[in-house]
Amino acid sequence: MNFFMDIRDKVFAATGKVKADTIFFGGLLINVNTKEMLYRDIAVKEGYIVGIGDVSSLKGDETEMIDVTGKHLCPGLMDGHVHFESSMVTLSQFAVPALAHGTTSVVIDPHEIANVLGRGGIELVLDEAATLPLNAFVAVSSCVPATSFETAGASIDVDDIVSLIANENVVGLGEMMDYPGVVFCDETKLSMIRTALKERLVVDGHCPALSREQLFGYMCAGISTDHESIEYEEALEKLRLGMKLMIREGSAAKALDKFLPRLIGDGVSLENVFFVTDDKHPSDLLKGYMDVIVRRAIELGLSPLDAISMCTINAAKHYRVDHIVGSLSMGRKADIIVLEDLEKFIIDSVYASGRPVESFVPSYEYPDTVFNTVKFDAVTATDLQIMSDADKDHRVRVIKVVPDLIVTENETFVLHSDRHGILMPDVENDVLSVAVIERHGKNGNIGTGFIKGMGLRNGAIGQSIGHDSHNVVVTGVDHSDMALCANTIRSMNGGICVVSNGKVVEQLELPFAGLLSTLPAEEVEKKLTDLHKAVKEIGCALPAPFITHSFIALPVIPSLRLTDMGLFDVDKFSLVSPIDEVME
């Protein structure tokens, strides 16, 4: 990924002193700068556009001519905010389906890897990104760990930020999830923001359901985007106050159908709105990426030109990279989607830097250190139980998951302890046991609690993906099955596991930082299909169970969470006991 071609070389190519490598001729160019569609040929040299329109003077004897007569030429699409680690494959393997579906640029916040491997992990991502045809811009992770109420494998401080933002691929400071730290003026968080703004980088936000005064303070700190709005009125108010609105349409959290029709109906300007995924599961990624969002936006009533703009130039302008990507314009990268049908957004072929994307083959080699990150002692059923007074009713706090959202609700439920004082799950009412096991070899913490909405009828599920500190999260009906699940993940050095009736029925190894596979997305998706089938057979009907499950431990999104340190009330921003009351 080369973001810069020598100016002299560009000028020579544009003026015909050297001839173009490739010319696309006969196509209808989609111009997101003027919202026009015009018949224009495009000349490309060393991956950059050096001529548009009559480019006959740039044609040489060795220039490749690509006939796109009758087709539309669209700028490569851009995902304005994604944690690529949610695909469960490495960045190189992620690039393959992304490019195939017309996404040629992404802004990645690699805070999953950062929480495990720290600054070195981000440097590794930047190094890998530089080898790819995918334009992988980086927003440096700002909240590692997300709070002090969990144990991460590493941390990112101001000195790390200073070092990392010197890289030319860095375009901003990643989402500032610690909004209390901002509004109460934590000096570390403010120093991070100052450092980014001083270098003219953007600072992305993460601020669901703030009070009006909190939002004022948060925005005045210099934070300019949000993708976490829960209700339309909240999103609209942020736009009115001058924030850029990211409409998120990922695998677990979806807002496109909720927000876009109302924005269109209210006649709101969309120039400060762009599309993001945040998280994309491999099964969804293989079916489509940003092209799926463009297609759906058109179905919801947006014009193709506006839908494409919200997936290209709008995001590029926000991140101040529109001089490189985001449009088919002079001097920009020749990232071109050839469309068979504009209205249905059917892709014929994709070119990154003027080359067909199918020519890319992942080849990056990773250091051994990334494959040894799951470090906890084997656990027993007893380690995962909550004990109290024997043979009594207890009012307990329960994490209630919400389908299609990553917010949770804070509920209470009455559970009865057995004669040994063990609080047992209530399977009939879908109140199950959940545990978070510290896996970075730091302290051996185990947080325990109760969860509703997973739907398991027997067995357990577990994974070493647990946003954001990525400790092992295990939910189950039976504590012995939960222990088996956790210990299987330990033996795999990271992954996902489903246990039923005392046996491991499916598992997926994720040895890279306990988060990713080095296999192609197709192979990971096949294994995930088996995992989804297995978890459905033990009762879970959630549309994206492992993504939903992975957010149980994230203590910056309302309302109730579980970390390795214990149950966390996000609204109170404090740890609370899983037992609310022992009832007489």
From Swiss-Prot:
Keywords: Hydrolase, Manganese. Pfam families: Adenine_deam_C, Amidohydro_1. Gene3D superfamilies: Metal-dependent hydrolases, Urease, subunit C, domain 1. Its EC number is 3.5.4.2. One of its GO terms (biological process) is adenine catabolic process. SUPFAM superfamilies: Composite domain of metallo-dependent hydrolases, Metallo-dependent hydrolases. GO terms for molecular function: adenine deaminase activity. HAMAP family: Adenine_deamin (MF_01518). This is Adenine deaminase. The lineage of its organism: Archaea, Methanobacteriati, Methanobacteriota, Stenosarchaea group, Methanomicrobia. The gene is ade.
